[in-house]
Amino acid sequence: MAKTNISPGMQQYLDIKKDYPDAFLLFRMGDFYELFYEDAVKAAQLLEIGLTSRNKNAENPIPMAGVPHHSAQQYIDVLIELGYKVAVAEQMEDPKQAVGVVKREVVQVITPGTVVDSAKPDSANNFLVAVDFDGCRYGLAYMDVSTGEFCVTDLADFTSVRSEIQNLKAKEVLLGFDLSEEEQTILVKQMNLLLSYEETVYEDKSLIDGQLTTVELTAAGKLLQYVHKTQMRELSHLQALVHYEIKDYLQMSYATKSSLDLVENARTNKKHGSLYWLLDETKTAMGMRLLRSWIDRPLVSKEAILERQEIIQVFLNAFIERTDLSNSLKGVYDIERLSSRVSFGKANPKDLLQLGHTLAQVPYIKAILESFDSPCVDKLVNDIDSLPELEYLIRTAIDPDAPATISEGSIIRNGFDERLDHYRKVMREGTGWIADIEAKERQASGINNLKIDYNKKDGYYFHVTNSNLSLVPEHFFRKATLKNSERYGTAELAKIEGQMLEAREESSSLEYDIFMCIRAQVETYINRLQKLAKILATVDVLQSLAVVAETNHYIRPQFNDNHVITIQEGRHAVVEKVMGVQEYIPNSISFDQQTSIQLITGPNMSGKSTYMRQLALTVIMAQMGSFVAADHVDLPLFDAIFTRIGAADDLISGQSTFMVEMMEANQAIKRASDNSLILFDELGRGTATYDGMALAQAIIEYIHDRVGAKTIFATHYHELTDLSTNLTSLVNVHVATLEKDGDVTFLHKIAEGPADKSYGIHVAKIAGLPKSLLKRADEVLTRLETQSRSTEIISVPSQVESSSAVRQGQLSLFGDEEKAHEIRQALEVIDVMNMTPLQAMTTLYELKKLL
C-alpha cells in the first residue's frame, strides 16, 4: 500500500484502515461509501461494481470503488454472507462547516456473527459463539446480537464444542485460546467458519452471574468485549446471561439432526420436508425461533414436558378460543428484533408503530387466554405485562402514516406537542396569509398584475413590471432590479416569510428531537418488552403444536419409568404429511424391559429406515412436549439419540463412508447410556463383506453387553440374525413381503422374526435394470446360496462369554492352533475403546496378515 504523495484525506483513510486490517473499510465521502487499495480491488470482484482510481494521472493511481450510501446495506449483506467483516467509517461533522479534512470515525464493525440490520431480514437466530479453554474444560458462550439472547455452558471436549457450534448454526466463532492444527482445519475448512480472536474480558456484573466457572466467565466476558468493541455503543437490549447444561436436554449431534431432517431437509437444505416445516403453524417471528429451539433441544424433565402437554390439551379442547388466539397473534410483530433496533439507535417511526400495534393486541390476547379458564394457562396469563403506558405513548405520539425515515418529517401526531402544532399551522396557513397580502396590495395599489413569487435568493417578493413602477406604494422596499421588472418586499410580507421559514426549519428539528425523546423513553421498557416477547413466543408455539395435533390427529404420549417402548400404529409424521394419510402404512414398535436391541432385516426400499426414523421423531416430538403421530404411545425418557442413517461420504473432510460410519459408531458406544436411543442403518456396508459383518457383530455385542441402550440395528447381513441365540436382549424383526406368481410386494410392515430373503434382485428389477442382467444375477445368487449351505457361519464368542469356548467343542476360527494362539495374544492386548478409527483399520490389517 503506497503512501507517497497522498492527500490528507487519504492519510486519514490509511490511519483508520490500520486499526481494521481484517475488514473491508467503507469510508463515507459525501453520498458514497468508498473503498481504496486492496479493499477496492477485491470488493469490485465480489460485489460486481466498477473499479476506478482516485488519481488517474499519477504514476501509481490508487484503486477505488464505491457504493451509494442509500443502498450500501445490500452490498454489506453480500460481503457478510461471504464471510467477511465490514468496518463503516462515517463523517462525524458537516463537510460545509469542517475546517480541513472532515472528521471521520468507524461507528460499527459488522461481522457474520453480529448482523443486526439487513436488506433481507431473516426471522432465524444468528448466533455468535465464543469458546475458551482452561486446559481441562471448554467454556462456550453464544449470543444473538439482534435479539439479545445470551447463554453459556461448559463442555468436556472439543467434539462436544464442535457439535454445539454446529447445532447453533453459527457463522463466526470467537476464540480466546490457540487451536491445534487439526481443530483449526475442522472449524475453518470443514465447517467454513470465520474465526475471530479476543483476549480481553469485559466485566459487567449486571449481565454475568458470578456463580459460573472460571472458563465460562472468560468465554462470556470475551464475547461481551467483542460485541461492544464491534458495535461501539451501550447495548441495553442484551439479556442477563443464562447458564445451561447440555445434559438438561435430549442430546443429539448435528449429524443426527441432519439425518432426521429436524430443521431442514438434508437433501434440499430447505425447510420444506423437515419436522420444523411440519410443526410450524406459528404466527410470529419470535414463535418461529422458539419452535426451532424446542426442536433442537427437546426436554428430559418429565415435569416440564407435562406442563407443555397440558396447555396443548387445553388449546385442543377449545377450538373457537384457540382460533381467536391464533388470529390475534397475527398482529404481533417481532418484539425482540424491534427492541434491539431501539437499543442500537436504529428504530424508525415504522418500527415504533409496529411495536405500538403489537402492544395494542396484548390485552386481547390476555383476555382470550383468561377465557380458557385453566390453571396451567393462567400461569402464562399472570406473567403478561401489557405495558399500557408505552402503548399510549406510541399511539398518541406517532402518526399512523409516518414514513420509514426520520428525516422526511410528518412523524409526530397533531396535538402531541404545542410548539410543533404552532409551526405546522404557520406552514399550513402561511400560503393563505401570503395570498391575502397579495390580494390586499393589488387592490390598494391598483397594479392589476401584481403578484407574489418566491426564490431561494430573494425569498418572497412582489413582482412589479417597469410599466407599473409609478404605482408602487411607499411602504414597498426594493429587493432586486431586473431588466424589465423590479422585486419588492414589505414589512408584513417579511414577517410572514420569517415565520414560515422559522416554522419549516424549527419544525423539522423539533420533530426530530421529539422522536429521539420518544425512542429514548421506549428504550427504558426494553427489559419488560423482552419478557413479554418470551411469553408471547411460548403461547405461539403451544398454539401451533395444538393446531398441528388437531389437523393431523395426533395423540398425547405417555411416559414410564420402566424402560418400555410401546407405540401402536405409529407413523413417520413428516413422511405421512408428504404422502397423505391414506397412502401411509403405520407400524407399531415395542420394546419390553428385557429387550434392548431390535435387529431388523429386509429388502432395501422396504421401509427399514423410515421405521427407524419414525421412532426417533416420535421420541423427539414427545420430549419437546408435542403430541405425536400414533394411536397410542408410552415411552421412557431418553437422554440422547445417536444415529447412523445414510451413506453419503464426507467429501469435504476427505472421509469415506466407512470412516464416517466408524466415527459415528464410536461416538455412540462411548457416549450412550442405558437411557439412550441408538439407530444404526446398514452399519459396515462401507467395507469388505466379512470386515463389515465382523464389525457389525462386534458392535451389536458391545451395545448388548456394555451399553444397554435401546437400539434398532438394520442390516443386510442376514447371518447376524443368529445372534438372538446368545444375546438374550436382542430380538429379530423384519419387513414383511408378499410373494405371488414370482412377484414380490413390499408390505412396509414390520413383523417378528428374521427375513428369509434379501430380495435385492427384485429391487434391481423395480429399478429397471436389463432382464439379461437380472437373469445372470439370479444364476449367480443360486450358485452362491448352494455353496453357502455347506459352509457353517462361525459364531465367535464375545468378551463376556468364556474364553475357553474352543475347548468346549466350538469350531476353531483358524486352521492350526499355533497361529490361533498368536492371534489370540494379539487380540487380548488391543484396547478397542481407546483406538482411533485409523488405528483400528491399521490393527485389523496387521491381524489379517497373520492368517
Swiss-Prot record:
PROSITE patterns documented for this protein: DNA_MISMATCH_REPAIR_2
InterPro entries for this protein: DNA_mismatch_repair_MutS, DNA_mismatch_repair_MutS-lik_N, DNA_mismatch_repair_MutS/MSH, DNA_mismatch_repair_MutS_C, DNA_mismatch_repair_MutS_clamp, DNA_mismatch_repair_MutS_core, DNA_mismatch_repair_MutS_N, DNA_mismatch_repair_MutS_sf
TM annotation in the entry: none
GO BP field: mismatch repair
Key words of the record: ATP-binding, DNA damage, DNA repair, DNA-binding, Nucleotide-binding
Chain positions recorded as ATP binding sites: 602-609
Cysteine pairings via disulfide bonds: none
Domain of life assignment: Bacteria
UniProt GO cellular component terms: cytosol
Gene Ontology molecular function: ATP binding; ATP-dependent DNA damage sensor activity; damaged DNA binding; mismatched DNA binding
Similarity-based family: Belongs to the DNA mismatch repair MutS family.
Record's function text: This protein is involved in the repair of mismatches in DNA. It is possible that it carries out the mismatch recognition step. This protein has a weak ATPase activity.
Protein's UniProt name: DNA mismatch repair protein MutS
